[in-house]
Amino acid sequence: MQKKEDNIKRHEIKFVFSDKNENKLLKNYELKKIFPDRIVESIYFDTSEFKFFHLSEEGVTPRIKIRIRGYNNGLFENLEIKKTNSYDRQKIVIKKFNYNLTDFYKNLKSFGIDGVFTKKLKVKYKR
């Protein structure tokens, strides 16, 4: 397993539009795709009371988000932990993560996250 921290400060704005409009925008503004299209799959974890979801919806800090994620292959190879507080956001990515409950909880505990979390939401989309 390989740990990577992404603490780059950024603000993202996301738009949804059709393939036709995407091609038009790329052409009209002479934009280039940085990455080829890919399938992103994520499984989000939460408590039985959906604590992480409610904290996020209410904008409460500190809060965390836990997910496993994969790209193009149906495998969930990355464990991602996002911690947000009132002054900072931290994203920890553990690459080549082989999902099993023992390693999952061991990794969370190493970052000070303790509790019982279950799979709550699976998301799949083309990026």
Per-region residue spans from a language model:
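Phosphate-end processing signature that detects enzymes handling 5′-triphosphorylated RNA
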Residues: M1-R127
